[in-house]
Structure formats: C-alpha cells, structure tokens
C-alpha cells in the first residue's frame, strides 16, 4: 500500500474522491501546499485506477480565492460579514443558539448536513443534537437522494445496505440500469460495466429511462418508460415472469415471505392497465421480462429515477420483488444495487444523521436502541427524544411557519438543491439564526447566513467514509487547510464544549471513530473490526466486519438469511399511483431534473474548473423536437419554462432522445451563475409518506418563447448520438461461445 509522505516541500497521500459515492481512491501530490497532480490508485477495489473528469480536475478547485478562511459574523442580514476569531464566532453563535433553545425548547433548532461530511463529523452531530440538546432535528441532503432506498431495503430485506458489490459486475450476465444515468453520474463504475460487456459481448445491458441518456446509448435494450411508470412496468414484468415460470421456486419457498399475497396481487390486477401506465409497448415489456428471466445472474443498478419520488420506497420494493422472485440476490453477479451520489451518504446512514436514526442502524422510536446509545454516550436515560425529528423539506416548512427558529447548515447548499426554492428562501429569511459551515464563500446559502464557520475539505483532513458498496475507507491530508479552516468534527465538538456538554474533548478523528464503531457491534452494519489502526494499515474494509481478524464481507445474504423477525425477505405488492402533481391544459409538459457529466451538485467545486465549465458552460432545457414545434421554439432560443411555483429563462436544446411531453433541466446551476436558471425554482416539495423524499423527477410545466428573446437560426444546440427519435432500442447481443 502507498503511505502518506512528505519532505517538507512535497507531500503525497491517498484519499477518497469527494464527488459521487463510487468511492474512487485517489493518489494526490502537492508542492508548497498546492495540489499539482491527482490520479486513480491502480489496486483500489472501487476504481481500479480509474478517474473521471471531475476527479482529475480537483487541483483546479481546492485552493481558490473564494475559500472561506476565517469565521465571519454579521449583526443583520442586510449588513456585511466581518471576520472574527474562532473564540468570538463560537461565543456569538452559542449564545444565540442557546437563547433560542431556552426560549422555545430544543425542537426549535435543527442541523441540516450532507453526505460530504466524514463519518466522524456525522457521529459528533448526533451526540450533540440527539444526545445532549435533546432534539432529533438532524437531517441531511441524503434525504433528497437516498431515503427511499434506505426505506426500501429496510422494509423488503430487514435492513439498509446494498447486498452486492462492484465485483459483481464481472459475474453478471444481465445488468439492468433503472432510473440511473451511470455514464454521467457514476462514470467510473459505468466504465467497469462497459469493460464487462467488451470482455463478453453476450452480456445484456438493459437501461430503463424516459430519456435516451449516454447510458442508454450503450444498452442492448433501452426501455423508455413513461415518467412515473416504473411500478406498473415492474408489476408487468413480474406477471410475465410468473406466467413463463422464470422464477426460482426453491429460493422463494426457503428464503421469502409474502409470496402468496404477491402472486394474488400480480395475477388479479389488469396486465393491460399496467402496460398502458408504464408507457412501454407490450412487446418491449415482454422482451425485457424474457431477457431478465433467462439470465443466470442479474444485477440491477438504480438511483434517483426510482428514489426521487413520493412513491420512491414503493419503487424500491417493487424492484426488490423481482430479484426475490428470480432468486437473484445474495450470490455473485446478482442483486439490487442502489448507487449513492455522495462520498459518505452511506456513512451518514451508519452514523445516524437522518432524523429518525441513531448510530449503528438504530432508530429513535425504539426504546432499546435509545438506551444503547444513551449508555454509550454516558447520558441519563431519557436524554434522547422518542419522537423522530423533522426531515429536510419539513425543516424548511417549519422555518417558514415559525415552528423552527434556528438552522445549522453544513457542507451543502440548500438554496440551490432543495425543491421549491422560493419556499426555501422565504424560510431561511424568516429564521432567527442561520449558521453555515462550508469551505467556500459566497454560495447561494452563505449569502443568507448570520454566522459562517470555515471548514477544511477534501485533501486537508483525515476522515472516514463509506462508498455505495459498503466499503469503509480512510482519507489522509495532502495539504494544510487554508487560514483558520478546521475539520467539520472539530467545529461541532468545540461548539458542544462551549454549550457545556461533556464527552467532546476529542484530540483526533481516530478517537471519534474508535468511539463510534462499538455502537455498530452486532448490528447489520457491524464495523467493530474496522478500527482506526486497522484502517490506517489496510486503507479499506467492507462491512459487516465484526472482529479485528475478519476480512470484511463482499456481499450480503449469501446464506439466504435476512435481518427480519423470521429471517426471510418480504414480498411487498405495490400498486401504481399517479405523481402528486399531474399535467393539465395550463401546464401540459412534465419536467424532470438530473446531473451532467461535467458538474456535481450545485457547482461550488466544479464551477471553478475551467475545463469542466468549458464542457458545460450554462444551464439549458432539453425539448423533444415535436414539442419544440408545438410551442414555437428552435434550438438555441431562450425559452420561458414555468411551473406553478416559478419561472426560468433557459436556452433550448432539441433532443429527440426525450419522450414526447417531457423536458429536462440539469439542476447544477444557481443564482450565482445567472438569474432564473435554478431548476428547483420549478420543482415541487411533495414528499413520500415514509421516506419523506421529494419528487424531483416529476412536476407539471409550460414552455414558451421568452417574450423579449431574439429568435436564432434553427440549428441543433448539440449533436450527439442520442439526438435520434426515441423508441425502444434493441441491440442483439453476440455469443462468445459460438464455434468459428
């Protein structure tokens, strides 16, 4: 293994990439405290030496002039920030925070964090807010992307956590990508998928997506499901698998519960109505089912297309039903694999950052779980509230209504990333106190703050994170933090000490990690054997890893035993429900949002890279050519795109790879990059009943030429292979075993 080295002028070390949840291990070199080179680590299990454009351009975005290098405060929102010392900033913030708690109670304050926080920071947040202040009002931007997957795994399989690992790509003979544009959002993992197909062209790659994405361009079968049509499509596939008897009777009998109810539901409902609601021709539905049914090993990657929905948990359940039906789980090359979009979204789940969770996959509404954590934290019985806290959207609604008075925001930019941004901005404006902890200033959110805490970021600190495949990794610093910036956990611990709470006198991140992992012992995410000393030596281990001698676990449920009351996975029949907001005469089109290859989240990093900005310089709206004609638009023209909540002005890109009636806007741009460009001014803040995840993938909009915009010459704004009419695309696979 490579170890961190320094000769006083140059340093090099390994760390986990700070972008998506693939968990690419990177080697970086610095000279005079400036990063000059980054490359993938060849023997790293996640990336095998691979690196995407975002990772490769990290040297361009770390040491920039807009780094937040000193704490800052201001007396009023209309006033200017002034730099202060850490002592002054903490004293000021704690005094105001405590005054609000004293007057309005502990549930009047909240912490809104991120999947970019290290596990050590996540743990300290919970200990402060849930164990000391006495409120469960901590949540994360992971609520916006992963909550439905968490709820889906837990309800179907008994616990959170993806059963497969990346190595399963090499054993799969059918790979489905459902509601994920892996080629742009998780490119290094998708490179492994492409390598698998290159090595064996008979491998199926099936992509289910309303858009012909760069991922769909690589597919042997592209299934253009209607927006919101996933559950009826899954149910229709289940019906065909039952009728063709392409199911695993032995697995169903030995390892599952609820099959009779599922069978009755699937066979009693109208197959034709499911096909119609899916928006997919019946012949294509049958083709999809046949390809899945004949596969010996079937692996499904899925992401925001399933999760970001008011029925996201149900979509997860419906997909898992198909894997249980075919016995495609708990073996090499198989399983439902939820991809995370941030480097430590998994770690936040393990550490209990979400408002209903406690460390070690425990839950605040379970008295035994609360007692376990209170004992570990040396807190009196009853210290942890019995009521789950507010979730992300609920927090901002509570700010707007006055129920919540103060919010501490860390490592995220909700003034761009939250749905219904007009509501979010009204909410933040009404807050008595907004603390923002970030590496950069200004951002759209720091502009609204009262107190700014400067945080060290990637390459500047030691920390731990968990990737999509349950791989726990250590990152080491390559440079020193600028100015007075310090790691997130230190900021939170100092704040807690200022509030008078004990148990926060940590000297190193390793102390925190070693305090945290005993709380996972015996839990589904058991990391008791992944000590800081072992991580420093071995770099990464995959949980469950219960002892210091344990090598880690490649995939879950290989014995067919699940962490449920009867040890069986659950079939959960789910019916089709229309999205919360539907189209009508006034708003006849559907808006969906998503990522681009060149950017990440709200561009607080990628927007500083000249190479990445050159690739994607500005926001746009993609429109099907028939819809463009109907609404009087041509490529390059500025259009006015409006929902019931807001209006944008964006240049048009014509893309026949969209379903008719669907428009697409990337969500990366905010007000700092131009007015009326943030997609989330349009999106709806409707959330699911259990997962509480917002509906980013479906809202009703109208489209028209901007009244004061010049009409350009008709030309395509972009020419790519996906600029072809959308239909189910079939590519015949080739057998590698045929005789010559």
Language model regions located:
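Short beta-alpha connecting loops at secondary-structure transitions
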Residues: 217-225, 454-456, 460, 470-482, ...
